[in-house]
Amino acid sequence: MVFAHRMDNDQPPVVTATLLVPLQNSSCAEAAEALLPHGLMGLHEEHSWMSNRTELQYELNPGEVATASIFFGALWLFSIFGNSLVCLVIHRSRRTQSTTNYFVVSMACADLLISVASTPFVVLQFTTGRWTLGSAMCKVVRYFQYLTPGVQIYVLLSICIDRFYTIVYPLSFKVSREKAKKMIAASWILDAAFVTPVFFFYGSNWDSHCNYFLPPSWEGTAYTVIHFLVGFVIPSILIILFYQKVIKYIWRIGTDGRTLRRTMNIVPRTKVKTVKMFLLLNLVFLFSWLPFHVAQLWHPHEQDYKKSSLVFTAVTWVSFSSSASKPTLYSIYNANFRRGMKETFCMSSMKCYRSNAYTITTSSRMAKRNYVGISEIPPVSRTITKDSIYDSFDREAREKKLAWPINSNPPNTFV
């Protein structure tokens, strides 16, 4: 049995029963060619031509490979370091352990997942010009590439709902930590089930290639449209509507159409800054992943491997840039996160409220263990004027009595 496959997966494989003749010399080869049907010979020649064409067009210039490697390497390092720092700061610092930061940790874990399980293999495929890890690994890499944006956009929708009820309806509904954990778990589980068809669509009958896009069959096209609507368009519209209501409430637009001054707003300034940060975070995420979904709907033909690889690498780099930008936004717009980073870098459970040096003494170690001590300092003998029968209040002596004893020339270190 001889199996002839088309490279673009448009048609099912053609199966034709032929006589297997050992091609040991040219005469036997000619005899075998005579036994093959004309249609199968055409597919065989097309397959050979496509293989040669692939080897020619799949080779990339050294400049393209070097440029892509530098940009992806910088984003990869920044994403790994930044998102790991986000998880570490929220874990160590109590000031950052809020309900909203549960969602932030979930997004950081999703960014770490795509940084480890997807992006390095995409760069490897682009730089080497072929896929060398097999069809099963191709399915796994593409699965994680579809999983993480869906999880993140629904986590962002959960944050939007939390901000909406916290600011607009603070007494009617509250997103507690248990509810936040359930919302995060639902986002991961539902999206993990929703992107399982990727295992069936991706992969190729050619072992040295991993498809960049979904196949152009009607099943692949239908799933692409459904994934674009459910995994991007609908949650994006809901996010925009919720934030529109939040912004409208912050600026206090009354029923009579009169806008109040911002200084008269009852919303705390810290919550306004949080809304600004997450609004900017949503915009960066949506604009970063929009090219990826558009490329799945409209993309170069899979046979043009060089063009498809360049387009796929470009949209992957743009979408991956959102993973590296999130820690930067947290550090710029969130003062508690900056303080948490200072506490984390101090490598101590004691919080660093000051940036200057702190003198560590025996008394300060006692204070760290919540001991309170008062050193009895004998008062200085002094002559008291007998103008009154009452002693005058001496503030300096009282302060000396309550002062900590400090040794001479104590060592200066950072907590």
Curated annotation (Swiss-Prot):
G-protein coupled receptor that plays a role in the regulation of circadian rhythms and energy metabolism. Participates in maintaining proper circadian gene expression in the suprachiasmatic nucleus (SCN), the locus of the master circadian clock in the brain. May function as a coordinator of aging-associated metabolic dysfunction, stress response, DNA integrity management, and eventual senescence. Upon binding to adropin, modulates mitochondrial energy metabolism via the p44/42-PDK4 signaling pathway, influencing pyruvate dehydrogenase activity. It comes from Mus musculus (Mouse). Residues 1-69, 124-152, 204-221, 299-309 are extracellular. Glycans are attached at N25, N52. Disulfide bonds join C138-C210. Residues 91-102, 174-182, 243-277, 333-415 are cytoplasmic. Disruption phenotype: GPR19 deficiency induces a shift in whole-body energy metabolism by increasing energy expenditure and decreasing glucose disposal in a sex-dependent manner. Male GPR19 knockout mice show decreased whole-body glucose tolerance, combined with decreased expression of key hepatic glucose production enzymes, under obese conditions. In addition, Gpr19-deleted mice exhibit a prolonged circadian period and a delayed initiation of daily locomotor activity by causing the downregulation of several genes that normally peak during the night, including Bmal1 and Gpr176. The lineage of its organism: Eukaryota, Metazoa, Chordata, Craniata, Vertebrata. It is a multi-pass membrane protein. Strongly expressed in the brain. The gene is Gpr19. It is found in: Cell membrane. InterPro entries: GPCR_Rhodpsn (IPR000276), GPCR_Rhodpsn_7TM (IPR017452), GPR19_7tmA (IPR047829). It holds the Pfam family 7tm_1. Belongs to the G-protein coupled receptor 1 family. This is Probable G-protein coupled receptor 19. One of its GO terms (cellular component) is plasma membrane. The keyword Membrane applies.
